[in-house]
From Swiss-Prot:
Species lineage: Bacteria, Pseudomonadati, Pseudomonadota, Gammaproteobacteria, Enterobacterales
Cellular component terms per the entry's GO annotation: plasma membrane
Molecular-function GO terms, alphabetical: electron transfer activity; protein-disulfide reductase [NAD(P)H] activity
Entry's transmembrane regions: 193-213, 229-249, 266-286, 310-330, 349-369, 388-408, 409-429, 438-458
Membrane topology summary: Multi-pass membrane protein
InterPro entries in the record: Cyt_c_assmbl_TM_dom, DsbD_gamma, DsbDN, DsbDN_sf, Thiol_diS_interchange_DbsD, Thioredoxin-like_sf, Thioredoxin_CS, Thioredoxin_domain
Residues in Thioredoxin domain copies: 457-590
Record-linked Gene3D superfamilies: Glutaredoxin, Thiol:disulfide interchange protein DsbD, N-terminal domain
Swiss-Prot/TrEMBL GO biological process terms: cell redox homeostasis; cytochrome complex assembly
Keyword Cell membrane attached: yes
Protein name, as recorded: Thiol:disulfide interchange protein DsbD
Length: 590
């Protein structure tokens, strides 16, 4: 009897299985049921014990918090020095390959330097699901208990005191000792600093000085072993590297105080203009160097050191790091300004250390083998200097791309490519060595290829290219529920698609880049009236809209019929590829 009952129950369960998808469709597709509300994905708690405040997040499995999106804003209170946990590295196509995230749990201990009875701390965080679903930034205001102001204390290398400031437009402001949003995806590896340092060694201001510097650090001691010569040269280079390393750490530490400001368009444009001026100095438009009086004072101080001794050579190298010749000032200033945006002390110090080592490698070779290894001076040295001018010009293009957008960024990169390869083409025409003509042909071809985006912008893209790649869909922007209702009423008998978008939503950008531009998707979307609500700023009116539409995160796409009613089971949450999205649209508008 028991076996018969078990068999009947099993048959009943198997019979109901095909009905489960149909019942699930009544409440939305399976794509939308797999995500939990933000308060469940990231359970936040806090505890204050005297002058110590602990913030903790319990992160649900399969979800993560962005380190760069954690923002702390004290109100009528002062926070002491602290650091955020390093987190784990995460590959992100749009934020960069080296984004720091937190999984499972996060605990932050904050020292309170001063607080009153009415003091508060605004804590903001933002995270996503591994499956491709992002939540809007969450903010919680924490009441603080009053404590007496503590005497000021210095900050260490690994920490910084916070200065409360309002977040910039777009919700990307960061007030924390963590790197800014683009700190980890700067298109600049520290190894590039090594190559730049080696290249700077072959500029007309630096290369002729190496034999003289080699003689100075070795002194009058002619009978030195190879090991001793190598040791003296390395000690000199390490002394120079120490100066540059400390300079990089100091610049990064200063940049920590202004990370939110470093994301402002006005400052990005100003930095881009400064980089352009530095590049012009490399092209010989003007000369940039330390005042001659300061250089003379440093030279006299260096000459007082004992030549041929390890301490004296080390001090000479450290002082040499302060000399800025016309050829080194511009690249060094560009690197310093660039790494100031990272706020990462170790990254900045290591970058400048590699830069100094790169400059010192030719010096070590000269000390060991003499000046015979050095190439002869000539016009090629000036060409090396000009080449670094183009390297510096890449930095303002990167900065302006954030302000002007991807389209103008592509045009600026195209313009830089045309200028660089065109310059290389002219140099190859003037060269007389074998193979220069073939290299000139290659440079000409690269110039024409680089000019393609500019050509498409000025004269329009070819029709066959447009039809192959698919044009970007045109959405009608909406911000409030009233505007959405008005657009639904005005829809000309067509179903309506409402896309909820934000810049901090990675999957939203994947939709825009991969799905919406697919030709089959574009064809199906033409049957819909397209609306889009940009909630990047996470303003109160935008949070109200998300609440009214019962949206817990992005990307979320809603579909309405021609009468303005949301189509049951049509709502999408999370990323969907072009093929699946096309099939979904065909079901809604066959």
């Amino acid at each position: 009897m028991a076996q018969r009952r078990f068999t009947l129950i099993l048959l009943a369960c198997l019979t109901c299985l095909p009905l489960l998808p149909a019942h699930a469709a009544l409440f939305g597709n399976s794509h939308g049921n797999q995500f939990i509300p933000a308060e469940q994905a990231f359970r936040f708690d806090f505890r204050q014990q005297g002058s110590q405040l602990t913030l903790s997040w319990d992160i649900h499995p399969g979800y993560y918090l962005y380190r760069q999106q954690i923002r702390l804003e004290p109100v009528n209170a002062t926070l002491g020095a602290f650091t955020l946990p390093a987190g784990s590295r995460h590959h992100d196509e749009f934020y960069g390959d080296d984004v720091a995230i937190y999984r499972d749990e996060l605990n932050i201990t904050l020292p309170l330097a001063q607080a009153q009875n009415d003091s508060q701390l605004r804590v903001t965080w933002q995270g996503c699901a591994e499956a491709g679903f992002c939540y809007p930034p969450e903010t919680q205001v924490i009441p603080l208990s009053a404590i007496a102001a503590a005497p000021p204390s210095g900050t260490g290398i690994g920490s910084t005191a916070l200065i409360p400031a309002p977040p910039p437009a777009g919700g990307q402001g960061i007030i924390t000792p963590a790197p800014p949003p683009q700190s980890n995806n700067l298109p600049f590896s520290p190894l590039w600093a090594l190559l730049i340092g080696i290249g700077i060694a072959f500029t007309p201001c630096v290369l002729p000085m190496y034999p003289l510097i080699s003689a100075v650090i070795l002194g009058n001691r002619l009978q030195l072993s190879t090991a001793r010569v190598l040791l003296l040269a390395v000690v000199y280079v390490m002394g120079m590297a120490i100066t540059y390393t400390l300079l990089g750490v100091a610049v990064a530490a200063a940049g920590l105080q202004f990370q939110a400001v470093l994301q402002q368009p006005a400052l990005l444009i100003g930095l881009a203009a400064l980089f352009i001026l530095l590049a012009l100095s490399m092209f010989g438009v003007f000369t940039l160097q330390l005042p001659s009086a300061l250089q003379t004072h440093l030279a006299l101080w260096s000459n007082r050191q004992r030549q041929g001794t390890l301490p004296g050579v080390f001090i000479m190298g450290a002082l040499a790091g302060l000399f800025c010749s016309p050829c080194t000032t511009a690249p060094l200033s560009a690197i310093l300004l660039y790494i100031a945006q990272s706020g990462n002390l170790w990254f900045s110090g290591f970058t400048l250390w590699l830069y100094a080592v790169g400059m010192g490698i030719p010096l070590i070779l000269v000390a060991l083998f003499g000046h015979r290894l050095l190439p002869k001076r000539g016009p090629w040295m000036q060409q090396v200097k000009q080449g670094f001018g183009f390297v510096i010009l890449a930095l303002p293009v990167f900065l302006l791309e954030r302000v002007l957008g991807d389209s103008w960024g592509t045009r600026l990169w195209s313009l830089l490519g045309v200028a660089f390869f065109g310059w290389g083409f002219l140099l190859c025409l003037q060269a007389r060595w074998r193979g220069a003509r073939w290299l000139a042909v290659l440079m000409l071809g690269l110039t024409l290829i680089s000019a393609r985006p500019l050509q498409d912008w000025l004269w329009g893209a070819p029709a066959d290219m447009t039809s192959t790649t698919g044009a970007a869909p045109v959405f009608q922007p909406v911000q409030t529920l009233a505007q959405i209702t008005q657009a639904l009423n005005a829809a000309p008998g067509k179903p309506v698609m409402l896309d909820l978008y934000a810049d901090w939503c990675v999957a939203c950008k994947e939709f825009d880049k991969y799905t919406f531009r697919d030709p089959a998707v574009v064809e199906q979307m033409s049957r819909f009236t397209l609306l889009q609500a940009d909630v990047t700023a996470n303003a109160p009116v935008q949070r109200m809209l998300l609440g009214q539409l019962q949206v817990i995160g992005l990307p979320t796409i809603l579909f309405f019929d021609s009468r303005g009613h949301e189509i049951p089971g049509s709502r999408l949450t999370g990323y969907m590829n072009a093929a699946d999205f096309t099939r979904h649209l065909r079901k809604l508008a066959p």
